Design a protein with these regions (language model features):
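Residue-level recognition of short, well-ordered coil/turn positions
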Residues: 136-139, 149
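Acidic/polar, glycine-enriched structural segments that form the non-catalytic walls/loops
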Residues: 1-41
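Helix-terminus loop motifs that line ligand-binding clefts
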Residues: 23-38, 64-126, 132, 139-143, ...
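Alpha-helical scaffolds flanking conserved acidic
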Residues: 9, 142-147
């Protein structure tokens, strides 16, 4: 509750309503598009916004299974993420989670924003770690999350290189 600011309180309630209208949490084949329930932009495709913003919300406000289904959505797309990385020249089980349609296919062409959005992998790891932090268990990591995090690590190990002039990885 935000006391003394009814407009902010109304805004928060509206946003919570939108989250609950957008996602029920009972089907791991479903996810939350970046525009949620009220916007058709992006065609309902999945970006990184869910992992950064929505997973923590659902972990803190609903039974943990609801947020776990958001994570399972990504876990079930791991084979497609590995295939996506392989098509781009990465190997050894590296995963690049695409901005996806419901079947896990990359939905953007290379020239658009496919390569500008590779930080989506990091948001998936963030959400997995948030799950463990907020639930106080390692169950999800042990059963599913570690496999995803290893594949993402394999991607980054091939994607970055050390810059001698900058003395850092780029």
């Amino acid at each position: 509750i935000i006391e003394g600011d009814p407009e902010a309180q109304q805004g928060i309630r509206y946003n919570i309503f939108q989250l609950y209208q957008t996602y029920r949490g009972d089907d791991p084949r479903l996810n939350i598009g970046p525009k949620g329930f009220t916007g058709e932009k992006y065609g309902g495709n999945t970006y990184w916004n869910t992992e950064l913003c929505c997973v923590p919300f659902f972990l803190l406000s609903t039974p943990k299974k609801i947020a776990e289904n958001l994570l399972m959505y990504r876990y079930k797309q791991l084979p497609k993420a590995i295939e996506n990385a392989r098509k781009l020249g990465f190997d050894n089980g590296a995963a690049l989670f695409p901005q996806v349609t419901s079947n896990g296919e990359e939905c953007h062409s290379e020239w658009e924003i496919t390569f500008e959005e590779i930080h989506r992998n990091n948001m998936i790891v963030y959400a997995i770690l948030q799950h463990s932090t907020l639930t106080g268990t390692l169950d999800y990591i042990a059963r599913y999350g570690l496999e995803v995090m290893i594949a993402i690590s394999r991607f980054w190990s091939q994607r970055v290189s050390f810059s001698q002039p900058k003395q850092q990885y780029v």
